[in-house]
Amino acid sequence: MSAGKLPVDWKTVELGELIKLSTGKLDANAADNDGQYPFFTCAESVSQINSWAFDTSAVLLAGNGSFSIKKYTGKFNAYQRTYVIEPILIKTEFLYWLLRGNIKKITENGRGSTIPYIRKGDITDISVALPSPSEQTLIAEKLDTLLAQVESTKARLEQIPQILKRFRQAVLTFAMNGELTKEWRSQNNNPAFFPAEKNSLKQFRNKELPSIPNNWSWMRFDQVADIASKLKSPLDYPNTIHLAPNHIESWTGKASGYQTILEDGVTSAKHEFYTGQIIYSKIRPYLCKVTIATFDGMCSADMYPINSKIDTHFLFRWMLTNTFTDWASNAESRTVLPKINQKDLSEIPVPTPPLPEQHEIVRRVEQLFAYADTIEKQVNNALARVNNLTQSILAKAFRGELTAQWRAENPDLISGENSAAALLEKIKAERAASGGKKASRKKS
């Protein structure tokens, strides 16, 4: 990240010249939840342990996985793949940000296909920028302040998708209990879709069903839809699109990532489905995986193609609600089901308004969801900019751009004995005096 023209008083050195590098010696399972010392592994969170091997100020770099970076001062212990990086005569806070700013360079040659990992040379051999001690302190302080603001902004932005998820469920709740179209209904008198009182449900699983408008009816699922099982051999349809549960995003109704039968290499029997049908995953119904097909294809036998007798989009939206998903997930007991069979699905109640009101509900829901989708897209774009901002600020810091004015105002703090060149000589002397030994270890 320090590539490009640096301030004339800065030095370019290999990181290994500025640090003592070692690793922990323990397995990750050495952690003790009641331990009194921090135990740094390759996980994002810090564990605890009852013994310590280091008593120093250091930066901890996970040697595999997410390559997380932390800093700590005091007694601690470390996992055998965690790198303990101790600064030699430079500020620990500065070293922390230096590693954050160069982590891409450190990990770009990461080895391992399943879990990437790095070696010591990936750390020690990279070139980094070295400013004077005073400027190191200032850079670390500026980065602490600026990136704390960035992280705060990022945290607030990351909360918005969950808020929007709750908003969508609230919209569906109001849609399916009649509140969303209450005023519309007062101005549009429509007869019930199923006028026969004997066909309307009053209870479900020995409990009274929620209240709905007078001209609505609670109907069994099999009264408003048919499950269209049509198993066929996929070998006869190699170029047909194959839809599986993993292609449907939970709670959104969005499908993506699907391929052809041939590309997926499937051989077992599949259901044939058609454009406009509802496709519902019966596996782990609590995941709420349902979509409306926008193409003809074949789907997993673990999915139900459904023909709706009412407005398809209305039934689809009902199947995305918390209420439907709770009923589908628990059947006759409180035990979460691994799958829902046709009998249990057929018995689930569906609140059924007159057809014109179904259309109006669908229109309003889609309008509100489109509004939420627009906000979510804006949030995702903002998050991308925030993530880029972090890297941009780090790049500016290690090109000397954040402290340019300070250098102009404080030439005495970057020259002579206070210079980066003088510091580098002191570091070399310190390394020579210690004989290049690694960090001292103690055990308690």
Swiss-Prot record:
One of its GO terms (biological process) is DNA restriction-modification system. The keyword DNA-binding applies. It comes from the Bacteria. The specificity (S) subunit of a type I restriction enzyme; this subunit dictates DNA sequence specificity. The M and S subunits together form a methyltransferase (MTase) that methylates two adenine residues of the sequence 5'-TTAN(7)GTCY-3'. In the presence of the R subunit the complex can also act as an endonuclease, binding to the same target sequence but cutting the DNA some distance from this site. Whether the DNA is cut or modified depends on the methylation state of the target sequence. When the target site is unmodified, the DNA is cut. Keywords: DNA-binding, Restriction system. This is Type I restriction enzyme EcoDI specificity subunit. CDD domains: RMtype1_S_PluTORF4319P-TRD2-CR2_like. Contains two DNA recognition domains, each specifying recognition of one of the two defined components of the target sequence.
